[in-house]
């Protein structure tokens, strides 16, 4: 073996020359106590509020309480392997998550890690989860419809792009079903190759404290119906630690803001915020923050307001993007006056109130039209819908009032009887099976038939059959009429004449 001293000395000189004396510094602290997902850490004197820290076993946490002699850290994971005396390292970054189109069709946890077994995300961008909401200047008032495909909502409680509309009701009243149908209703806009990017709405579903089986079922329905391709699922299930349930809505919101700030449109459903409030209460009490009403901390209102204020419609100078929020709140025994429901009602731009009684009567979606309201109103409707839906809300309100009195008196005059008959048929018309969202122009035609007396002669049980037959006829023989309503966005006298002729002919032959 030939050893050349000159070569060896040359290599050694190179290595000595390139020797780097810089060491990697990181500020570390020690765990004083740990339990219930909270660690008290000593020694992290310069840590920021909301900064990520890493424990010696690789689990991450977030510094929430900055006290004189220690730091309260919430742990994003199991605290079983963390012991007193373990080292904790500052990571120097505030909590952030991956964002961008790479997340579409994926299921991620509250920190943006994939949990669907489909491999890494390869996202090119990251965003902080807790950022300031857009100010007044970049915003624009809500004026574009955000179609849900549900007649009861699109006609009576319209939602616009950039609005925050609360879905509130007891357990098992169909709150998640409304979110699911709204997601499915965006499918035609994504399938339409000729449609512009402005018509597409990307959907984000944040599951907070749900059963894993429920989330899996939601994902399965989206996948089967081809809606997962434009959706992101953020899941912090019931078995996840409270800090994960607390941060999941903020993470989902950051993912939606990516689309909003790039001139696109996104819709986010938080299911549900009452469980996030419970998780936040648990963390706050364990961090020894003073409790307030119902033992919630004093800043639980701020928790929800800063989250929901991030839903906005931006003006043209800022890209005209939008983020629409559909927060869900679960009530106990229809008590809307509890702490969290009243908080979120006061933050949002209206609420869709679902009632158990209506649900069991077979009125589904079980929307209480009297208590539900949209504070954006007809600004979020196309003119055609305004033309037909303007009278329906008043008629239904009168019907409910009369129906209450009619229980006591049997001899009713003809006009009252007519009002009750019309109301019963309109209520029947607003029923809609799950997974069958309707296009806006189809809703307009069916409601037009209802408010113009075409249902009055029918038995209430025939209303659904009449509607299905009418829509089948229009789709097969008169698609150009539906297309005209969709493109012109109003019912002109010419279209009205054609529609009346079709309805007259159909009603005459209907049996």
Swiss-Prot record:
Keywords attached to this entry: ATP synthesis, ATP-binding, Cell inner membrane, Cell membrane, CF(1), Hydrogen ion transport, Ion transport, Membrane, Nucleotide-binding, Translocase, Transport
Signal peptide: none
Annotated positions binding ATP: 169-176
Recorded GO CC terms: plasma membrane; proton-transporting ATP synthase complex
Gene3D superfamilies on file: 2.40.30.20, ATP synthase alpha/beta chain, C-terminal domain, P-loop containing nucleotide triphosphate hydrolases
Subcellular location: Cell inner membrane
Main location: membrane
Marked site positions, Required for activity: 372
CDD domains xrefs: ATP-synt_F1_alpha_C, ATP-synt_F1_alpha_N, F1-ATPase_alpha_CD
Membrane-protein topology: Peripheral membrane protein
Protein name per Swiss-Prot or TrEMBL: ATP synthase subunit alpha
Organism: Bartonella bacilliformis (strain ATCC 35685 / KC583 / Herrer 020/F12,63)
